[in-house]
């Protein structure tokens, strides 16, 4: 954005001219880094802190941001405002220093709300599918020449970034319910993909509280705004009478305003028809597998149709959709070293899904697209509380694969909970008599323990939200081959 455009943007809110230096605590998170990237491109001085470098921090360094890989009081010196991730505790030395210096401290969603304030905001919320749906909406609007700004919780692979500053009037953003901070947003259009019990510590363990929070989020829409909601979801169907705004429903259900019909999956692509009110049927080829992605596409099409975007632009965007990072992310197909006289190839897929519903959707997509493959899953449970709260659901879902290897629970800062650990979960699954899970106590042993279970006609799903994505990439780098001690030392 040039100086004239920046001046025009800042002149909308004259007080924003006082803001020069914005500091982010926890800047390496995808959501935080995305907002920082948009603000850097708007011309603000950006600094931030995190514990370790990652691709997000590298992208920001490339844009001229100052990044500290520590948390120290002096990092916030001269900041006009400090933006804090929900993962950061109140006693963080930078937060304490900001309060002492009377520097405003705001949450990530509050800054996102400021970005959205004078744009046509489209917010995508829901327990599952937010990131992919955000990328689909962004891709359609970009294909239509509308040059949107987008802020996503995952890498938009076609753009190579989590966020991008556009010159159009639209801002398309993932809305995060995990800490209820999406209540700061005031979009013109809101998508809600589904509502399930997750992040229940935020909602005092009360599902009714979670449902009411989604209603409050939708009530942030102006009376002339629109809620786009998946009517297949029983909770959404229950809540529809309470929305109090114009609504468009979508789903496989016969009463959906935008209805998915005749779904068929061939390899990584979905093929289906969308039936829309007062519109010609749309025959879609979607470059993303699974019925869940057909629903995500239906939500994106509902929004784009309401905006008047041409069907041809919609179809081009969906057929060429490149997906998002760590969402059924195909990392390669590798020849296998002969093991027990077997040889062949194995496909490697990395997926972020860490809730039983998400894991189930990924397994179903793999089975539908590659029905003859031996399905091997390397799974890392995420958080002890989630493992405890959804223990039986995890045990049921994980029995659907042919072979299961399980890493220890990724704690995400939580203390261990007795009975909510990977060893207990493996024992429960084994007791159901369908598969015999393998506990992997050390991530360094993954390739070694994986090799003997491969048949030469395999699809390996690396599944979870912790540091397992790094393990997936390392498996791709070594092409699934166990390393000798000499090779590991050389690496």
From Swiss-Prot:
Main location: cytoplasm
Its EC number(s): 6.3.2.8
Pathway involvement of the protein, from the record: Cell wall biogenesis; peptidoglycan biosynthesis
TM spans (from-to): none
Keywords, comma-separated and alphabetical: ATP-binding, Cell cycle, Cell division, Cell shape, Cell wall biogenesis/degradation, Cytoplasm, Ligase, Nucleotide-binding, Peptidoglycan synthesis
Disulfide cross-links: none
GO molecular function: ATP binding; UDP-N-acetylmuramate-L-alanine ligase activity
Reaction catalyzed: UDP-N-acetyl-alpha-D-muramate + L-alanine + ATP = UDP-N-acetyl-alpha-D-muramoyl-L-alanine + ADP + phosphate + H(+)
GO biological process: cell division; cell wall organization; peptidoglycan biosynthetic process; regulation of cell shape
Gene Ontology CC: one annotated term: cytoplasm
Compartment(s) where it occurs, according to its Swiss-Prot or TrEMBL record: Cytoplasm
Domain of life per record: Bacteria
A Pfam entry, by short name: Mur_ligase
Residues the record lists as binding ATP: 126-132
Function, in words: Cell wall formation.
Family matches, as HAMAP family: MurC
Similarity remark: Belongs to the MurCDEF family.
Protein name, per record: UDP-N-acetylmuramate--L-alanine ligase
């Amino acid at each position: 954005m040039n100086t004239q455009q920046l001046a025009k943007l800042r002149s909308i809110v004259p007080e924003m001219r006082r803001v020069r230096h914005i500091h982010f605590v926890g800047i390496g998170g995808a959501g935080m880094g995305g907002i920082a990237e948009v603000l850097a491109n708007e011309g603000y001085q950006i600094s931030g802190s995190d514990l370790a470098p990652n691709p997000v921090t590298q992208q920001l360094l490339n844009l001229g941001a100052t990044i500290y890989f520590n948390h120290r009081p002096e990092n916030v010196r001269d900041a006009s405002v400090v933006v804090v991730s929900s993962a950061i505790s109140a006693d963080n030395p930078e937060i304490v220093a900001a309060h002492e210096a009377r520097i405003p401290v705001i949450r990530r969603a509050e800054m996102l709300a400021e970005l959205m304030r004078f744009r046509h905001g489209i917010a995508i919320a829901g327990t599952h599918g937010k990131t992919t749906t955000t990328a689909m909406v962004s891709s359609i609007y970009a294909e239509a020449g509308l040059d949107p700004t987008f802020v996503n919780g995952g890498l938009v692979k076609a753009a190579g970034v989590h966020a991008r500053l556009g010159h159009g009037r639209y801002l398309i953003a993932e809305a995060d319910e995990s800490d209820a901070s999406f209540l700061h947003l005031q979009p013109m259009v809101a998508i809600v993909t589904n509502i399930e019990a997750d992040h229940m510590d935020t909602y005092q363990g009360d599902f009714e509280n979670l449902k009411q929070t989604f209603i409050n989020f939708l009530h942030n829409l102006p009376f002339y705004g629109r809620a786009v909601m998946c009517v297949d979801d029983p909770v959404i169907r229950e809540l529809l009478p309470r929305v109090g705004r114009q609504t468009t429903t979508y789903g496989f259900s016969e009463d959906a305003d935008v209805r998915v019909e005749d779904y068929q999956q061939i390899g990584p692509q979905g093929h289906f028809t969308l039936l829309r009110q007062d519109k010609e049927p749309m025959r879609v080829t979607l470059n993303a597998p699974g019925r869940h992605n057909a629903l995500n596409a239906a939500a994106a099409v509902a929004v784009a149709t309401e905006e008047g975007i041409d069907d041809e632009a919609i179809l081009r965007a969906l057929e060429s959709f490149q997906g998002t990072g760590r969402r059924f992310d195909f990392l390669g197909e590798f020849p296998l070293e002969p093991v027990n006289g077997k040889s062949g190839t194995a496909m490697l897929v990395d997926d972020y899904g860490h809730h039983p519903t998400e894991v189930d959707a990924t397994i179903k997509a793999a089975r539908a697209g590659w029905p003859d493959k031996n399905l091997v899953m390397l799974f890392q449970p995420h958080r002890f509380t989630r493992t405890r709260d959804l223990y039986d659901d995890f045990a049921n879902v994980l029995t659907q694969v042919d072979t299961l290897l399980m890493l220890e629970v990724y704690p995400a800062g939580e203390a261990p909970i007795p009975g909510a650990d990977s060893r207990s979960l493996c024992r429960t699954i084994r007791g159901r008599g369908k598969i015999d899970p393998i506990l992997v106590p050390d991530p360094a042993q993954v390739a070694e323990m994986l090799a003997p279970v491969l048949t030469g006609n395999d699809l390996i799903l690396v599944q979870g939200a912790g540091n397992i994505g790094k393990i997936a990439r390392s498996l791709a780098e070594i092409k699934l081959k166990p390393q000798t001690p000499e090779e590991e030392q050389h690496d």
